[in-house]
């Protein structure tokens, strides 16, 4: 039986967090935070199933690169207690396999984030043993990304 779990958090400098670090963790990657010079390396983390960045059609193409997107967010927010991103962690039903997980998340993100002009970075984790705790991390902008004006 599927177990419902949804957790929401705010990634804030005031609590010592970084959007770049959160993105590196969820994507099991290594990203340099240009704001504070810290290299966040989660390449040894296991269980990454899928990752994708969803952007509104008018968002800059270079935001498809995770490091560029989240460093732009860090650069844009200037104060020591800036709210940088919203983070969602949602349990995925073990009864389904990877393809329906991707489809469910893609539909949800397009309807709830992209349609409202927000970027969202998503990753599915299925840690060892596989099927034990499948879940998705969604990192979204706090502020709606505005279309570029000519």
Sequence positions of predicted segments:
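N-terminal nicking endonuclease/strand-transfer module with a His-rich metal-binding environment
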Residues: 1-145
């Amino acid at each position: 039986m599927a177990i419902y779990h949804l957790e929401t958090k705010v990634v804030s400098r005031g609590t010592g967090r970084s959007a770049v670090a959160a993105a590196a963790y969820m994507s099991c990657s290594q990203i340099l935070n240009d704001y504070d010079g810290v290299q966040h390396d989660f390449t040894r983390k296991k269980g990454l199933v899928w990752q994708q960045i969803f952007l509104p059609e008018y968002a800059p193409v270079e935001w498809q690169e995770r490091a560029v997107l989240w460093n732009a967010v860090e650069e844009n927010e200037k104060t020591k207690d800036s709210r940088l991103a919203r983070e969602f962690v949602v349990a995925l039903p073990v009864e389904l396999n990877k393809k329906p997980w991707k489809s469910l998340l893609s539909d949800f993100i397009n309807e709830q984030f992209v349609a409202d002009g927000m970027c969202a970075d998503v990753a599915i984790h299925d840690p060892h043993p596989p099927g034990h705790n499948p879940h998705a991390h969604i990192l979204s902008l706090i502020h709606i990304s505005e279309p570029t004006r000519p």
